[in-house]
Amino acid sequence: MNGADFKGSDIRGCDFGQAQLVGANFERARTGQTRRQVFLPLVVAGAFALALAYGLSQMVFGALGQTPEQSAWMSVVMLHIFSGLAGVGSASSALFGWGGRVGRAGIYLSGVCSAALTGFFYLGSYFDQNLKAAIAGAVAGAGLAVVFSLIAKKPMGVIIPAMGAIAAYGFSFLVWTAAIAHLSARQYIWGVGLGALSLVYVWFAICSLQAVGRGVSQLIGTSFRGANLTNAQFDQGNLKNTDFSKAIGR
């Protein structure tokens, strides 16, 4: 495609990776994301978030009133641990970004814990509340989250914060019910402390939802990765969400 004329063209969503575009004209070309590229990650993220939301709601309401003496107590403990870690991991990634170690660790932690929660509920429910099956589901879910985080980093930057927001809100609800119970028993220090923690996790959920929007905006639309762009013209081009990594310039 050397010398090709794309003047004024709409090339959103096009992949020019490794292409020979010497002297090509992209004057006033429009790059970036198509509507499909914007909405598809949102739809996928919404589907995963809804799956987690349903499972989490069932586990949260099932956990209310459980005591350490009951057989389901281990599930309650795992619910608190995984939802709490997923919420704080997603929020740390939203606050510190993917660039730093804290942000990267947070997004992986949130993805693993959110997927573990989902696998824990659905496989455990399929095998009639069997704890061993639920644990196997949690391990499988965590493993899949790691794999997808490595091979699809950009889409997971939308999916994981969406699931992290759900997990954070679920943990907030759990802690809030515990806070009310302590306040009702006149254990004010515990009640106030847990109430404050619940509000912190509401904020974590909001941060995660904001990260979903940022994740969509960072998805690559037009790609020139590895392309030969020697003497290519981009005058007055609207270059948004465009990948020029490893491209050859002048």
Model region roles, listed by residue range:
Residues 83-91, 139-145, 200-201:
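Hydrophobic cores of alpha-helical transmembrane segments in multi-pass inner/ER membrane proteins
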Residues 1-58, 67, 114-123, 131, ...:
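Tandem repeat scaffolds
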Residues 108-109:
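Interfacial transmembrane-helix boundary/kink motif in multi-pass membrane proteins
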Residues 40-101, 114-117:
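Core alpha-helical transmembrane segments of integral membrane proteins
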